[in-house]
Amino acid sequence: MLSVEALEVRYGGYLALSDVSLHVAAGEIVCLMGANGSGKSSLMNAVSGLVTPAAGRVTFDGADITTVPTYRRLARGLAHVLERRRLFSYMTVRENLLLGAYVSAMRPARAETLESVLVMFPALRDRQSQLAHTLSGGEQQMVAIGRALMSRPRFIMLDEPFLGLSPRLVIQVGETMRRINAAGVTVLFTEQAIQQSLSIADRGYILESGRLALTGTSAELLANELLQRVYMGLDGATAIDDGADAARGADGAAVEEKEPR
């Protein structure tokens, strides 16, 4: 469904992604993991059209969308929930949600789609007139995901959906992602916590300093000795940040476990 081939992203002279390739099949939940600055958000921004790759190709449903404008990618069924939610703080919950249905083809079905979103997030039903900035972090995340669902996507990307949430809310958001997937929407999300992410995802990719370091099914990654030793540590810690420095060799180069070309 989604393929990224040899992607390179630059911000001026800074190389954020180098030669990154991945594939997400229809119906999957796939997690993109890595420490802060590893390139996770840059990859998602390139897929949704918020940044233009310096090299490489992005295809969606077999069509090359590398240079397609963001709004047209949305119309094709590709939605993106940005890191830190990015709601309109002084607009109501309802107003924020309805903005997700601005694509002309979705407007006639706004009422029906809004009802389906409120069924998925019942806590928002009685808060539709509440200003977004007065919501808790978990409620704001519900609004951000609901706004993306208003476009009726077939593929949704969530950038760090657990950021700043309590353990209880992390579980709730994870369950929501499974429900979205069960409804026929393919899911790609980013996260730093490995065990937590792989308990939700079918497969995962790990980025290190803008390059692909590891990939495999959730079971394969959890059983991988390099991942256990470098990223998770002997105590089973889940944060990739803890192992980021150890994942570099003596010369500072990232340790990668990929098949040679």
Language-model features, listed with the residues they occupy:
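ABC-type ATPase nucleotide-binding domains, specifically the catalytic core motifs of the NBD
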Residues: 12, 68, 93-112, 120-122, ...
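The feature captures the beta-strand-to-loop junction immediately N-terminal to the Walker
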Residues: 33-35
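Helix-to-loop junction immediately C-terminal to a conserved catalytic motif
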Residues: 48
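ABC ATPase NBD coupling module
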Residues: 52, 64-85, 107-114, 126-129, ...
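Conserved ABC ATPase signature
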Residues: 131-135, 139
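ABC ATPase C-loop
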Residues: 148-149
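Conserved catalytic motifs of ABC-family nucleotide-binding domains
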Residues: 152
